Regions:
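A conserved short alpha-helix in the GNAT/GCN5 acetyltransferase fold that borders
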Residues: 10, 101-104
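Extracytoplasmic electron-transfer domains, predominantly the class I c-type cytochrome c fold
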Residues: 54-101
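Sec/Tat signal peptide C-region and signal peptidase I cleavage site
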Residues: 14-19
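Bacterial N-terminal signal peptides
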Residues: 4-13
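Periplasmic/extracellular electron-transfer cofactor-ligation site
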Residues: 20-51, 74-79, 103-110
């Protein structure tokens, strides 16, 4: 019985880790489809549009605002006139946000 319990826990933890990886993959796919024309969506490379910040640099501003997830669902838009408004359902918004958090650059020295 104990072996069965330990096996179940191990399987559950592996499945949980895989689901998180799958969520990150889904978030990246959404960003590639909707945003990569202007923004860099990965851990490296410059954005195709020099005025569009790479998503890996958002930690200092947007990602940790308490309402960022809600703004992704309500329709995220920018003051930049060429940027279209995007609206995500809750699952997609969470996948996008969690992927973006996973690729963030370390904070710059002297900042929290």
């Amino acid at each position: 019985m104990r072996c069965l319990l330990l096996s179940s826990i191990a399987l559950w933890s592996i499945t949980g880790a895989y689901a998180l990886d799958e969520e990150h993959r889904h978030g990246k796919e959404l960003l590639q489809k909707m945003c990569a024309r202007c923004h860099s969506v990965g851990r490296t490379s410059a954005s195709p549009n020099r005025q569009a910040p790479p998503f890996r640099s958002f930690s200092e501003t947007k990602l940790y605002d308490s309402d960022f997830l809600q703004r992704l669902q309500d329709g995220y838009s920018s003051i930049h006139p060429a940027m279209p408004t995007f609206r995500f359902n809750r699952d997609d918004a969470e996948a996008v946000l969690n992927y973006m958090k996973a690729i963030q650059e370390p904070p710059k020295p002297g900042r929290k």
